[in-house]
C-alpha cells in the first residue's frame, strides 16, 4: 500500500454524540466484520464500557475502502474516549493521526468536552473535519449547529457531512470526506525504524500488546526491537493490524497503525509514548512522547477482610498493566488495617477502577474519602505535597497550605446560566470570563479542585438539566485557609475518617458528618461519643445512647439502697466495658463521607 493511499484518523465527540455507533457503521460498510460478528459498540471491549455506554480505552481498526475514484484506501481509525477523566487517552490517540472527525449531535450542538479535544487536535496541526450526526432525530437542527460550530470552534462547517449513524444515512459521504480531506501520512520507509507506542495492554497469554503508529521505517516479524527509553531489546513475535480482530500481517510500514507483541512481561517494559526502534539500526533520537499523567484525586482502598490483601495487591498490579495512569502505594490505617493509597484522574475513573476490582477480581473494598494534593509550606521553609489527611503536619508547624486550583470551562444554554453561576459561587469559584455564542454561553471559572472532584459534575448536570458541559485542567496552587477535620469516636481519632476542608465549611461539614455517623453506627452496651475536631478544638458532638437492661425489675418494694446498689453495679460494669470495648464502624460510615454536603 502506497503512502498516498493511507489515511489515519480518529473521532472526537462529546459523550453520547454517537461516536461508537458511527465507528460500528464504518466497520460494517468496509466489511471489517461479518454480519454474525457485528455487535453494538464493537470497539468497547470492556463490559463496563458497554454498560455505562462510555469508551474508556483507545482501540484501533484498519479498514480497506474502495473509494468513488476507483482506488482502494487503507483507513486506520483510532477510537477515543469522550469523558473528561480520560482526556489524556484522547491526546495520545490524536498524536498517532493526521486528521480527526469532529462529530457533533445535530440536536444538542457543541459541548465543552468536544471543544477541549478539538483544540488539542488543532494544536497538533491536524485536519479537523466536522460531521453532523443524528440528523434522523425530530429535534435535529443541522443549520443552527453548523453555525454554532463555526462560531465556537472556528472551523468552516457549512458543507459539513450530515449523517445518521443509527440509520446508516450518509455513511459513504463520511468515508469520502476522510479520503478527500485528511492528508496522507509522511514518513520515509527506508529511514531507521521509529514507532510510537500509542497504547499498551496486557494479554494473559501473549504478554504486553502494544498499539503502535509507525512514523518511519518498517517493522517485520522476528525483528529484534529496542525500546528507546530503557534500551531493552526484545524480539517481535507478532506484527499485525486490527480489523477489529487481531490479524497477523508480518509487516508494518511507515504511516501504518498496528499492533506488536514481543513477549514483554510487564507494562512498564513498553511505556506509552515511548519509541520503538530496531536493535541493528537504531534511530538517533526518540519521538516526542506524551506528557506524564498526574493523578488528581487520591483515595485509600482497603479490603474488608484482611485475608484479601495479597489478592488485592495482585489485582492492582494487573489493572495497572492496562491502565498506565493508575498510581498506588501501600498504606495502613489503625481503623481499616492494610490497604493501598491510589491516585486517580477523577471521580469517574475512581468509580470505574473500584467497580473493575470488585467485579473482575471479586474483592470487597472500603473506600475512604477522596482528597486532592495540597502543597504545604512548613515553618522550617520546607515544601511538602500531601495527598492524605493523616499525613498533614501538626497545626503549629504549618506556615501555609496551598490548594490546587483548576480552570473550568463550562458551556451552558442561556436559560440555565443563573443556576450554574450560583453553583460555582457556592463552590468558592472566581469567574474569569464569559462569552455568548448564539444560544450557548461559555463561562470560565477558577475553582478549587477539591470542590470539583467531590460532586461538582453531578450538581452541574442537575442544575442545568443535563445541558451544561464541563472541561477542566489544573492551573496552579493558591494559598487557602484549609484545616484538617478529625473525627473522634470515644476520644480516639479515626484516621480513615479525617478530611481536609476549607475553614469556612469546616464546622458545617463536621456537624453533618457527626449526625450522619450517629445514624449509621449501631447502638452498643455503652455510650459512644462522636466528636468532630479541628486541631484541638471540638466543633461538633453527638452521643449514641447505650442499651441498658432494667436491673431493678426484680425488686418488689423494699429498700431504696438495694436499688442503688444494683444501679451502681451496672454503672461500674458499663464503665469497665467502655474502657475495653471498641466500636465497629460499618462500611456505610465511610460512604457517608463521600456524601457529606450534598
From Swiss-Prot:
Domain tr-type G, first and last residues per copy: 4-186
Membrane topology type: Peripheral membrane protein
MF annotations from Gene Ontology: GTP binding; GTPase activity; guanosine tetraphosphate binding; ribosome binding; translation elongation factor activity
Pfam families: EFG_C, GTP_EFTU, GTP_EFTU_D2, LepA_C
InterPro entries: EF-4, EFG_III/V, EFG_V-like, EFTu-like_2, G_TR_CS, LepA_C_sf, LepA_CTD, LepA_IV
Keyword annotations from UniProtKB, A to Z: Cell inner membrane, Cell membrane, GTP-binding, Hydrolase, Membrane, Nucleotide-binding, Protein biosynthesis
PROSITE patterns in UniProt: G_TR_1, G_TR_2
SUPFAM superfamilies: EF-G C-terminal domain-like, P-loop containing nucleoside triphosphate hydrolases, Translation proteins
GO cellular component: plasma membrane
EC id: 3.6.5.n1
Single GO BP term: positive regulation of translation
Binding site for GTP: 16-21, 133-136
Reaction(s) catalysed by this chain's protein: GTP + H2O = GDP + phosphate + H(+)
Highest taxon listed in the record's lineage: Bacteria
Protein's cellular compartments: Cell inner membrane
Gene3D superfamilies, per database record: 3.30.70.240, Elongation factor 4, C-terminal domain, Elongation Factor G (Translational Gtpase), domain 3, P-loop containing nucleotide triphosphate hydrolases, Translation factors
Similarity comment text for this entry: Belongs to the TRAFAC class translation factor GTPase superfamily. Classic translation factor GTPase family. LepA subfamily.
Its biological purpose: Required for accurate and efficient protein synthesis under certain stress conditions. May act as a fidelity factor of the translation reaction, by catalyzing a one-codon backward translocation of tRNAs on improperly translocated ribosomes. Back-translocation proceeds from a post-translocation (POST) complex to a pre-translocation (PRE) complex, thus giving elongation factor G a second chance to translocate the tRNAs correctly. Binds to ribosomes in a GTP-dependent manner.
Identification of the protein by name: Elongation factor 4
Organism: Pseudoalteromonas atlantica (strain T6c / ATCC BAA-1087)
Amino acid at each position: 500500500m502506497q503512502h498516498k493511499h493511507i489515511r489515519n484518523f480518529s473521532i472526537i465527540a462529546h459523550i453520547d454524540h454517537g461516536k461508537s455507533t458511527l465507528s460500528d457503521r464504518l466497520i460494517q460498510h468496509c466489511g471489517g466484520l461479518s454480519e454474525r460478528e457485528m455487535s453494538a459498540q464493537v470497539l468497547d471491549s470492556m463490559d463496563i464500557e458497554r454498560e455505562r455506554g462510555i469508551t474508556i480505552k483507545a482501540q484501533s481498526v484498519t479498514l480497506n475502502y474502495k473509494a468513488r475514484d476507483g482506488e482502494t484506501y487503507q483507513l486506520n481509525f483510532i477510537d477515543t474516549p469522550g469523558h473528561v477523566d480520560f482526556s489524556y487517552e484522547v491526546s495520545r490517540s490524536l498524536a498517532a493521526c493526521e486528521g480527526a472527525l469532529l462529530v457533533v449531535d445535530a440536536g444538542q450542538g457543541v459541548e465543552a468536552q468536544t471543544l477541549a479535544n478539538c483544540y488539542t487536535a488543532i494544536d497538533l496541526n491536524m485536519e479537523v473535519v466536522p460531521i453532523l450526526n443524528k440528523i434522523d432525530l425530530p429535534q435535529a437542527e443541522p443549520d443552527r449547529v453548523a453555525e454554532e460550530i463555526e462560531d465556537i470552534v472556528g472551523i468552516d462547517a457549512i458543507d459539513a457531512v450530515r449523517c445518521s449513524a443509527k440509520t446508516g444515512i450518509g455513511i459513504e459521504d463520511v468515508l469520502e470526506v476522510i479520503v478527500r480531506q485528511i492528508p496522507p501520512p509522511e514518513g520515509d520507509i527506508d529511514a531507521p525504524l521509529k514507532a510510537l507506542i500509542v497504547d499498551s495492554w496486557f494479554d494473559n497469554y501473549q504478554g504486553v500488546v502494544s498499539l503502535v503508529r509507525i512514523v518511519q521505517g518498517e517493522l517485520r516479524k522476528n525483528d529484534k526491537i529496542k525500546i528507546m527509553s530503557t534500551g531493552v531489546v526484545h524480539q517481535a513475535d507478532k506484527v499485525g493490524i486490527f480489523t477489529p480482530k487481531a490479524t497477523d500481517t508480518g509487516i508494518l510500514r511507515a504511516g501504518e497503525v498496528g499492533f506488536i507483541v514481543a513477549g514483554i512481561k510487564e507494562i512498564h517494559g513498553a511505556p506509552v509514548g515511548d519509541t520503538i526502534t530496531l536493535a541493528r539500526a537504531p534511530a538517533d533520537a526518540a519521538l516526542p512522547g506524551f506528557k506524564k499523567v498526574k493523578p488528581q484525586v487520591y483515595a485509600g482502598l482497603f479490603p474488608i477482610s484482611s485475608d484479601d490483601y495479597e489478592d488485592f495487591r495482585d489485582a492492582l498490579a494487573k489493572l495497572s498493566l492496562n491502565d498506565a495512569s493508575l498510581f498506588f502505594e501501600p498504606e495502613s490505617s489503625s481503623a481499616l488495617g492494610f490497604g493501598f493509597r491510589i491516585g486517580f484522574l477523577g471521580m469517574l475513573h475512581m468509580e470505574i477502577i473500584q467497580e473493575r476490582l470488585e467485579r473482575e477480581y471479586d474483592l470487597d473494598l472500603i473506600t475512604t474519602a477522596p482528597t486532592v494534593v495540597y502543597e504545604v509550606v512548613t515553618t522550617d521553609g520546607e515544601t511538602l505535597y500531601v495527598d492524605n489527611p493523616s499525613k498533614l503536619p501538626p497545626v503549629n508547624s504549618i506556615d501555609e497550605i496551598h490548594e490546587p486550583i483548576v480552570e473550568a470551562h463550562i458551556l451552558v444554554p442561556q436559560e440555565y446560566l443563573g443556576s450554574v453561576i450560583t453553583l460555582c459561587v457556592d463552590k468558592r469559584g472566581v469567574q474569569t470570563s464569559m462569552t455568548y455564542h448564539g444560544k450557548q454561553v461559555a463561562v470560565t471559572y477558577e475553582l478549587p479542585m477539591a470542590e470539583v472532584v467531590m460532586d461538582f459534575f453531578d450538581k452541574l448536570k442537575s442544575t442545568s438539566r443535563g445541558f451544561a458541559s464541563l472541561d477542566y485542567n489544573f492551573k496552579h496552587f493558591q494559598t487557602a485557609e484549609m484545616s484538617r477535620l478529625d473525627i473522634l469516636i470515644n476520644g480516639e481519632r479515626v484516621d480513615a475518617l479525617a478530611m481536609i476542608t476549607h475553614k469556612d465549611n469546616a464546622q458545617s461539614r463536621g456537624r453533618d458528618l457527626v449526625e450522619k455517623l450517629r445514624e449509621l453506627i449501631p447502638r452498643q452496651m455503652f455510650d459512644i461519643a462522636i466528636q468532630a475536631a479541628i486541631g484541638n478544638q471540638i466543633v461538633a458532638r453527638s452521643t449514641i445512647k447505650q442499651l441498658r437492661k432494667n436491673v431493678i425489675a426484680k425488686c418488689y418494694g423494699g429498700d431504696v439502697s438495694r436499688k442503688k446498689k444494683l444501679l451502681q453495679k451496672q454503672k461500674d460494669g458499663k464503665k469497665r466495658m467502655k474502657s475495653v470495648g471498641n466500636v465497629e464502624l460499618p462500611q456505610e460510615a465511610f460512604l457517608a463521607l463521600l456524601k457529606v454536603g450534598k
